[in-house]
């Protein structure tokens, strides 16, 4: 019985013979169709072929009655993907290929091929209904992706363009409780990454912008939501293309890789270049070294119940060739993945961070590119939740936000490394020791978590920074390392007793455990250096923004000034009320008749600012009302009030109306004349006393500068408050924080704390920021 009769009896189309001839002679009937081998196979060929490791996961279907195979030469009308490719209409018995009507007309309509015998396939009603259902499903999927649009997620400066989780979910256009995975793509610029995503996920729609121009059309990181596969698709900027902020853009790629569940590395080259393996190897090393720890910290900090970094993402290397064979074609016994691992080992790169690495290649004889194999591989990996499970969009945003906050900031040009795609300098702190030049080994922005700078190497001494630290020798011998500093007095001494002891026996070194271990003038002669007797010296690193370590903490002079100032201020505050009352009464007694009495002036007549007890009230010489200093700072002659031709203080309103002559009656002029002489005498006395006070203030300022501790910022350099940025004036006094030495206003430095590290063992003025620091200052 012939093979044709056997097939007809089974209800199959005639001509469905094995197309592989791997274990048979090609005369056995076809039982299976392998979509990835693109052939019909008999029982023996199917078993022998798919016993190989690289072919083991191919999708095969068993042929049913009335089965019609796909057309062999084409991938469907207009080169569409296999999801909508054409079924064959005939089979050429001479060429032994299946042809659709279009391919038959194109290839067998002329020449000798016209005479080739053909067998017509009969399409059953069952097959027609199945194809109709497939087309309906395909149409539904296309319709689901019609409204998808991409949006800029992160710009080229590493700044996230989404404000919060709600904004991220709104732009993705997905449900807040939707569980999804993240698929991102990487590759060199111009290799068609955006084009690949458009055809793999969105049926060729230009969701991600593509351009035939030389300039890259993808700048930054763009994202879109695929409702069919329920994944967030991320398009990235190409490698080897950026010329500005290259280091920051490269670092941005690793942030995207860290939040991805599946990574596609797209390469359009006849052979796999070393750049691919170096990129993946360096990315793996940087991921394990810097990002795994941060992702775990984010999980704990945000209270997430999803492990973000159990294993890194899976990687698919999508390799498109034109003139060369695909990887592994000349070694059928070896899987392409094994050959890729060998390449990694030869280059000394070990991609341990990735959960798996897969190879998917396609050879494009004639455009367009076939993305069907890539799509099938992606769908298989997306269904696998063993290592990476889907998660809420909010979790994805939190992870990206945490990585962006942690690893941000400019990367200096001198720290750019060309031997690695992701050098440590992209992710570690950029601070350098001012003394030895060693770099900090901690991650970027570690100061926000209260972690101090650290270096791998020891520092060297620099006289400029005096980077020595004293530690108690006795405590060190007992296994403890306790830092000590020279200071004016012991913590057990009262402020005045400490000053007296300092004048007699000099500065002290006090250990919290051992007490006072050294006094500089304890004996009349023969006092030894503390380094030779009671302390050890260590050389430490000097980081930008920190002070030197053994600056002069002898603040005896400043303590004396603070004490005198405190007593003077106390007396002044106690006598402020009576003094002001007496002054106001005397002023009213000698004031002209048209002046409003001080007791009736509660606020400025122009700006309505209420006067405090110690505020000065000024009278306008023209109208006699009470004003603050800023509303009565102008001067002009007021001869109509008897002040003569000399300019005197007037308010802003009277100054603006200086061309209008006041109508003063003769009786008023006589009354004012009597009291005006007394007021002029009073002002002359007041101005004389003010000049004396100013003359005293100048040497007093010199005394303050001389008594100022070394770490205090000089008064003449302090122009505004270090915290609130208010400019200092006559009314706004400057105050030094005893911890950091910066200048502050009273509101920003009204707290009091002991600062032992600066020699202040009793509560003294500290700024708002220093007061928030935990532990001893």
From Swiss-Prot:
Keyword Repeat assigned to the entry: answer is: yes
Q: Which residues bind Zn(2+) 1?
A: 604, 607, 628, 631
Q: Does the keyword Zinc apply?
A: yes
Pfam families found in the cross-reference section: ANCHR-like_BBOX (PF22586), FYVE (PF01363)
Report which superkingdom the organism of origin falls in.
Eukaryota
InterPro entries recorded for this chain?
A: P-loop_NTPase (IPR027417), ZFYV1 (IPR042427), ZFYVE1_first_BBox1 (IPR047856), ZFYVE1_second_BBox1 (IPR047855), Znf_FYVE (IPR000306), Znf_FYVE-rel (IPR017455), Znf_FYVE_PHD (IPR011011), Znf_RING/FYVE/PHD (IPR013083)
What compartments host this protein?
Golgi apparatus; Golgi apparatus, Golgi stack; Endoplasmic reticulum; Preautophagosomal structure
Gene Ontology MF terms in the entry = 1-phosphatidylinositol binding; phosphatidylinositol-3,4,5-trisphosphate binding; phosphatidylinositol-3,4-bisphosphate binding; phosphatidylinositol-3-phosphate binding; zinc ion binding
Q: In which tissues is it expressed?
A: Ubiquitous.
Q: Where is this region: Required for localization in the lipid droplets?
A: 416-777
Q: List the disulfide bonds.
A: none
Where Zn(2+) 4 binds, per the record, is at 737, 740, 767, 770
**What processes does the entry annotate via GO biological process terms?**
cellular response to starvation; lipid droplet formation; macroautophagy; positive regulation by host of viral genome replication
Amino acids binding Zn(2+) 3: 721, 724, 745, 748
Q: Where are the zinc fingers (FYVE-type)?
A: 598-659, 715-775
Give the GO cellular component terms, alphabetically. autophagosome; endoplasmic reticulum; endoplasmic reticulum membrane; extrinsic component of omegasome membrane; Golgi apparatus; Golgi stack; lipid droplet; mitochondria-associated endoplasmic reticulum membrane contact site
**Gene3D superfamilies, per the entry:** P-loop containing nucleotide triphosphate hydrolases, Zinc/RING finger domain, C3HC4 (zinc finger)
Q: Which UniProt keywords apply?
A: Endoplasmic reticulum, Golgi apparatus, Lipid droplet, Metal-binding, Mitochondrion, Repeat, Zinc, Zinc-finger
| Binding-site positions, Zn(2+) 2 | 620, 623, 651, 654
| Known partners and oligomeric status | Interacts with RAB18 (in GTP-bound form). Interacts with BSCL2 in a RAB18-dependent manner. Interacts with ZW10.
Summary of the function given for this chain in its UniProt record: Plays a role in the formation of lipid droplets (LDs) which are storage organelles at the center of lipid and energy homeostasis. Regulates the morphology, size and distribution of LDs. Mediates the formation of endoplasmic reticulum-lipid droplets (ER-LD) contact sites by forming a complex with RAB18 and ZW10. Binds to phosphatidylinositol 3-phosphate (PtdIns3P) through FYVE-type zinc finger.
The name of this protein is Zinc finger FYVE domain-containing protein 1
